[in-house]
């Protein structure tokens, strides 16, 4: 699995969302590389890991990332949040958890109302086989919908989607299955790690209400909602997201991974 390493300081692992790659975090790299050693993951089937056939399943991917990185704070965006949360719940070397536009469960249920219908991800899966490019374009449009900087963010996501090669259909389908079926809420009450939950106020995929509900399940969690932010708030509101990550890590005890 390809992992770019840049910067200096405490270690921070960054895991991207569905269909993208580690380069999507460029705005955060620009702001954090002087203070953190950043480990930018390309998930299997994505970016420079396009030929990596590791199954896109939580234990396989988390194990591979953990084997290639030192003790660190793990930060996941969207789908990447599932890997980061699983790591924080199972690995002592994870010193803290940051979730950006990510929750332990992405689909709606009777006891989890503030999420998307399962049919949303099912439809993306069906359409991939008949209209690969159009399906990805529709998903990117959903990523930025509602954001105050939607046009600029959409241009950036389109560029990041193709600059390292398109993701594989296999990896995309496996990612959709994770989004449809994963429920990690049970791990939160006993997480035992500091956590930060960063939501976009206008996110159409992951409701800030759901993120606040998830944070409430984790003892001592911090929750932040970025005003006017969409599903990728680190693009249009990079200063705010970077500052939140800086403050979060700085507040950790040395044992947790603070400076």
From Swiss-Prot:
Pathway: Cofactor biosynthesis; biotin biosynthesis. The keyword Hydrolase applies. The keyword Nucleotidyltransferase does not apply. It comes from the Bacteria. The active site is at 78 (nucleophile), 203, 231. Belongs to the AB hydrolase superfamily. Carboxylesterase BioH family. Substrate binds at residues 18, 78-79, 139-143, 231. It catalyses: 6-carboxyhexanoyl-[ACP] methyl ester + H2O = 6-carboxyhexanoyl-[ACP] + methanol + H(+). GO terms for cellular component: cytoplasm. InterPro entries: AB_hydrolase_1, AB_hydrolase_fold, BioH, Carboxylesterase_BioH. One of its GO terms (molecular function) is pimelyl-[acyl-carrier protein] methyl ester esterase activity. Monomer. It is found in: Cytoplasm. The physiological role of BioH is to remove the methyl group introduced by BioC when the pimeloyl moiety is complete. It allows to synthesize pimeloyl-ACP via the fatty acid synthetic pathway through the hydrolysis of the ester bonds of pimeloyl-ACP esters. Its EC number is 3.1.1.85. SUPFAM superfamilies: alpha/beta-Hydrolases (SSF53474). This is Pimeloyl-[acyl-carrier protein] methyl ester esterase. Its main location: cytoplasm. One of its GO terms (biological process) is biotin biosynthetic process. Keywords: Biotin biosynthesis, Cytoplasm, Hydrolase, Serine esterase.
């Amino acid at each position: 699995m390809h992992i770019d390493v840049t910067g200096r300081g405490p270690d921070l692992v960054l895991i991207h969302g569905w269909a993208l790659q580690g380069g999507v975090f460029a705005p955060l790299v620009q702001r954090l590389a002087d203070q953190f050693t950043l480990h930018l993951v390309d998930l299997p089937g994505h970016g420079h890991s396009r030929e990596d056939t590791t199954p896109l399943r939580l234990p396989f991917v988390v194990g591979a990332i953990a084997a290639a990185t030192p003790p660190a704070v793990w930060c996941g965006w969207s789908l990447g949040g599932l890997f980061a949360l699983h790591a924080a719940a199972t690995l002592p070397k994870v010193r803290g958890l940051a979730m950006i536009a990510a929750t332990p469960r992405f689909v709606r249920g009777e006891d989890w109302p503030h999420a998307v219908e399962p049919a949303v991800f099912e439809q993306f899966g069906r359409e991939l086989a008949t209209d690969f490019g159009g399906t990805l374009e529709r998903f990117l449009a959903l990523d930025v919908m509602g954001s105050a900087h939607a046009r600029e963010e959409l241009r950036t996501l389109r560029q990041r989607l193709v600059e390292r090669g398109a993701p594989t259909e296999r990896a995309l389908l496996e990612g959709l299955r994770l989004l449809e079926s994963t429920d990690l809420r049970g791990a939160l009450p006993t997480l035992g790690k500091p956590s930060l939950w960063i939501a976009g106020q206008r996110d159409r995929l992951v409701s800030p209400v759901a993120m606040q509900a998830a944070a409430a399940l984790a003892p001592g969690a911090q929750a932040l909602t970025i005003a006017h932010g969409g599903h990728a708030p680190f693009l249009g509101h990079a200063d705010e997201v970077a500052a939140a990550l800086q403050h979060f890590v700085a507040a950790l005890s040395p044992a947790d991974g603070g400076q």
